[in-house]
Design a protein with these regions (language model features):
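Residues that scaffold, gate, or flank divalent-cation-dependent active/transport sites
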Residues: 1-130, 135-137, 144-152, 161, ...
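Long, highly charged, low-complexity intrinsically disordered interaction regions
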Residues: 164-182
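Secondary-structure boundary elements
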Residues: 156-158
Length: 182
C-alpha cells in the first residue's frame, strides 16, 4: 500500500512531503512582509496607518508600510505627498536602514535555536531569512511542528511572517513569497 503524504496546513507550504526521513537538503525561507514597519512601530499602535519614508531621487517615497496603511491603499515606492493626500493622519517616520539590518541580524541569531545554518535573504527589497534544517527537524517533532513553533514564536513578538520549506532555496523562497496565504 503506498504511503500517503501527511496533511499540511495551508499556512506552511511544503515540497514534497513533511516528516519523512531526511534524504537531502531542506531549506526554510522566512519572509517578513512588514518587517521595517513592525520593528519600529509598537504593537499596540499598529491599528493606525504607519509608514517609513526615505529620500529617493529628489523626492520622499514610502520605504515601508504597515498592514493598516496597506489597507488604505498605500504601498512601498509611493510618493509621500500622494500618500499624505490619501491618508492625512498617518504616522510617518524616516527610514533607518541600519536599524532594520540590526533587528534582522538579532532575529537570525535567535533562530539558531532551530539550526546553526541561518543566513539573510539577499534579494533586494526582501526582508527574510533562510535556514538549512537538514537533519534538524526531528529534534522538534518533525518539520510541521518545527515550522509551527517558529511561526508562533515570531508572531508572539508582533512580527508578520510567511514561512515555507522545500528542497531548494529558490523553491522555499518562492513559496514563502507567493505560496498559499503568503
Amino acid at each position: 500500500m503506498p504511503q500517503s503524504t501527511p496533511h499540511v496546513p495551508p499556512q506552511v507550504p511544503v515540497l514534497p512531503a513533511l516528516d519523512t526521513a531526511p534524504t537531502g537538503r531542506r531549506i526554510v525561507a522566512i519572509w517578513f512582509p512588514h518587517w521595517l514597519s513592525e520593528i519600529v512601530m509598537p504593537a499596540e499602535k499598529r491599528d493606525a496607518p504607519f509608514v517609513l519614508a526615505e529620500h529617493q531621487r529628489g523626492t520622499q517615497r514610502l520605504a515601508a508600510v504597515n498592514i493598516a496603511a496597506e489597507a488604505c491603499g498605500l504601498h512601498t515606492g509611493m510618493a509621500l505627498a500622494d500618500a499624505r493626500a490619501l491618508v492625512p493622519d498617518m504616522h510617518i517616520e524616516m527610514l533607518d536602514p541600519a536599524r532594520g539590518a540590526a533587528a534582522l541580524d538579532k532575529c537570525a541569531r535567535w533562530l539558531r535555536r532551530y539550526t546553526p545554518w541561518v543566513g539573510a535573504d539577499t534579494h533586494p527589497d526582501s526582508h527574510g531569512l533562510l535556514l538549512d534544517i537538514s537533519g534538524c527537524a526531528h529534534l522538534f517533532g518533525g518539520e510541521r511542528r518545527m515550522l509551527d513553533d517558529m511561526r508562533a514564536r515570531i508572531n508572539r513578538r508582533g512580527i508578520t511572517c510567511c514561512i515555507a520549506v522545500a528542497d531548494t532555496i529558490g523553491s522555499a523562497w518562492a513559496l514563502a513569497h507567493y505560496g498559499p496565504d503568503s
